[in-house]
Amino acid sequence: MNTNKNILILTANYGNGHVQVAKTLYQECERLGFKNVTVSNLYQESNPIVSEITQYLYLKSFSIGKQFYRLFYYGVDKIYNKRKFNIYFKMGNKRLDQLVKKHQPDIIINTFPMIVVPEYRRRMGKVIPTFNVMTDFCLHKIWVHEHIDKYYVATDYVKEKLLEIGTHPSNVKITGIPIRRQFEEEMDKDKIYEKYQLSPDKKILLIMAGAHGVLKNVKELCESLVTKEDVQVVVVCGKNTMLKSSLEDIEALYPNKLRTLGYIERIDELFRVADCMITKPGGITLTEATAIGVPVILYKPVPGQEKENALFFEDRGAAIVVNRHEEILESVSSLLADEKKLNEMKKNIKSLHLSNSSEVILTDIIEQSEIIMNKKQTVRALS
């Protein structure tokens, strides 16, 4: 593999997933020996104020703007096809031009739908091999552009959707979504139980409560579950210090039944010992769940890519989608009590995993970029 390539990875922090994939690809580049790799949060660098405002509105959409987000997501075909969303096509253009001139990239990798990149190529007449690493289990048309050389997708379902709208089969590769290597390493579970003071003889429910819009009644759910003899609850609060504080009284009363944690770097450890998990249906978290084989309960997914992700996993028997507040406790309790269903769901979610996605993607990107540039040189020689 030619590791002398200059690689530019573009991302945006609308949700953590796109940035996490960019970081994962960067780390894999380092592991493979690439020396000239740059990661750019393009919109943040291009216009910090606008970026901050739109990120805030994005986060608010999980609680107060769901219908607006639904209209945007499902109405994007009309916006995109009629090119009425012209401002989006130009966002970050100046910053992109600066990055291209400074780093002279041989390859551009997008982990967010950066239409500005293929539009820049089209306007400038530059041939910079450009690749989209898609971060969900569904297709959103805003990822698609004639000047994207290849798409790396999670499943055959996404590939089929791309082919339906005219993408050539050779321009799509099913690779899975890149996740941190730690999720694919072997670990001793006994050490994890000991580290977090958990019992291997009880069912463990993991609640990923730090993400926006996961679950609002965490305290109520914990109060109900800690009374059950054979269940332990682990709540990861992330940076949500208010939530962690609100659970401390329950934890003090039931120290062997409830664990409340802040930000956890090695979250894969908790995935490994969890019997099921309540989480947000983001593409990265769901891919991490497939790597470990932990069934997921998805509460009231936001219309758009999260809803589509949730339905994909539910249809394949890998997740339970709960849309009503009062159904959460019953869904959790019945699943944890049903060993057969738990094992079926573990098998189903594990079957969705594709390993070593980052390495597979980067290896193919290098190969494809060389094919593209060789074609360019051949055309020049003949003209």
Swiss-Prot record:
Pfam families: Glycos_transf_1, MGDG_synth. GO terms for biological process: enterobacterial common antigen biosynthetic process; glycolipid biosynthetic process; lipoteichoic acid biosynthetic process. Coiled coil: none annotated. Its EC number is 2.4.1.315. The keyword Cell membrane applies. It catalyses: a 1,2-diacyl-3-O-(beta-D-glucopyranosyl)-sn-glycerol + UDP-alpha-D-glucose = a 1,2-diacyl-3-O-(beta-D-Glc-(1->6)-beta-D-Glc)-sn-glycerol + UDP + H(+); a 1,2-diacyl-3-O-(beta-D-Glc-(1->6)-beta-D-Glc)-sn-glycerol + UDP-alpha-D-glucose = a 1,2-diacyl-3-O-(beta-D-Glc-(1->6)-beta-D-Glc-(1->6)-beta-D-Glc)-sn-glycerol + UDP + H(+); a 1,2-diacyl-sn-glycerol + UDP-alpha-D-glucose = a 1,2-diacyl-3-O-(beta-D-glucopyranosyl)-sn-glycerol + UDP + H(+). It is found in: Cell membrane. Keywords: Carbohydrate metabolism, Cell membrane, Glycosyltransferase, Lipid biosynthesis, Lipid metabolism, Membrane, Transferase. Its main location: membrane. InterPro entries: Diacylglyc_glucosyltr_N, Glyco_trans_1, Glycosyltransf_28_UgtP, Pro_diacylglycrl_glcsylTrfase. GO terms for molecular function: 1,2-diacylglycerol 3-glucosyltransferase activity. The keyword Lipid biosynthesis applies. Pathway: Glycolipid metabolism; diglucosyl-diacylglycerol biosynthesis. One of its GO terms (cellular component) is plasma membrane. Belongs to the glycosyltransferase 28 family. UgtP subfamily. Processive glucosyltransferase involved in the biosynthesis of both the bilayer- and non-bilayer-forming membrane glucolipids. Is able to successively transfer up to three glucosyl residues to diacylglycerol (DAG), thereby catalyzing the formation of beta-monoglucosyl-DAG (3-O-(beta-D-glucopyranosyl)-1,2-diacyl-sn-glycerol), beta-diglucosyl-DAG (3-O-(beta-D-glucopyranosyl-beta-(1->6)-D-glucopyranosyl)-1,2-diacyl-sn-glycerol) and beta-triglucosyl-DAG (3-O-(beta-D-glucopyranosyl-beta-(1->6)-D-glucopyranosyl-beta-(1->6)-D-glucopyranosyl)-1,2-diacyl-sn-glycerol). This is Processive diacylglycerol beta-glucosyltransferase. It comes from Bacillus licheniformis (strain ATCC 14580 / DSM 13 / JCM 2505 / CCUG 7422 / NBRC 12200 / NCIMB 9375 / NCTC 10341 / NRRL NRS-1264 / Gibson 46). The gene is ugtP.
